[in-house]
Amino acid sequence: MSSASMFGSLKTNAVDESQLKARIGVLALQGAFIEHINIMNSIDGVISFPVKTAKDCENIDGLIIPGGESTTIGKLINIDEKLRDRLEHLVDQGLPIWGTCAGMILLSKKSRGGKFPDPYLLRAMDIEVTRNYFGPQTMSFTTDITVTESMQFEATEPLHSFSATFIRAPVASTILSDDINVLATIVHEGNKEIVAVEQGPFLGTSFHPELTADNRWHEWWVKERVLPLKEKKD
């Protein structure tokens, strides 16, 4: 994806301190960060904001690494030593971190495919990803994915179906440990491909849930992954 935002401008969410449930940072070096922030700021009790420096990472309850160019985002992380060290510290601390598309690549232990190697990976998840698995940007598509029963999506029907947008998307081509929980798959050219995984506090989705009108992934992540860990710490 290009670095330009696809939808509108950044929106804020005025939340009284007594009603504040979670502070969600979105890495804002490049990619579709505005869309994630705007969705998060539409959720009751959530404040979301851009993360560009190590200082921006202070007092956050969760972090989203958005889609974009994994090589570009990786380079920008790598040249900012303070930000890089802070992100690695958040991984070591077990902060809930969600990577979408390029963000999933950055969370992986290994990556392959693409024109250039990734200059930096956080190596938080025991997966190997294949970049640009479905082809170039001209072959982007939207399709229904099947999510597991454990997702516990609410309200919107069908309960376990979700329309997902894939833009030069990766897949989790190799699972490197039994600690990986597969959350969603699609069938592509007759093969079942893994497009969403989690490992402990880390979530990776190869698609862009921020580019649809369905906010269930964001709501689920806050309710089922961010808030329980925050409550344990509090």
From Swiss-Prot:
Q: Quote one Gene Ontology molecular function term.
A: lyase activity
Superkingdom is Eukaryota
> Cross-referenced SUPFAM superfamilies, in alphabetical order?
Class I glutamine amidotransferase-like (SSF52317)
Name a Pfam family for this protein: SNO
User: What positions does UniProt annotate as the active site of this protein?
Assistant: 101, 208, 210
Q: Which reaction does it catalyse?
A: L-glutamine + H2O = L-glutamate + NH4(+)
Q: What are the record's GO terms for cellular component?
A: cytoplasm; cytosol; glutaminase complex
* EC code: 3.5.1.2
Principal subcellular localization: cytoplasm
Localization of this protein: Cytoplasm
Query: What GO biological process, any one, is recorded here?
Result: pyridoxal phosphate biosynthetic process
Where L-glutamine is bound, by residue?
A: 68-70, 131, 167-168
Enzyme class, first EC level, given as a word? hydrolase
User: Which controlled-vocabulary keywords does the entry list?
Assistant: Cytoplasm, Glutamine amidotransferase, Hydrolase, Lyase
Instruction: Enumerate the PANTHER family for this protein.
Output: PYRIDOXAL 5'-PHOSPHATE SYNTHASE SUBUNIT SNO, PYRIDOXAL 5'-PHOSPHATE SYNTHASE SUBUNIT SNO1-RELATED
Which family is this protein grouped under? Belongs to the glutaminase PdxT/SNO family.
Q: What is this protein called?
A: Uncharacterized glutaminase C222.08c
Q: Which organism is it from?
A: Schizosaccharomyces pombe (strain 972 / ATCC 24843) (Fission yeast)
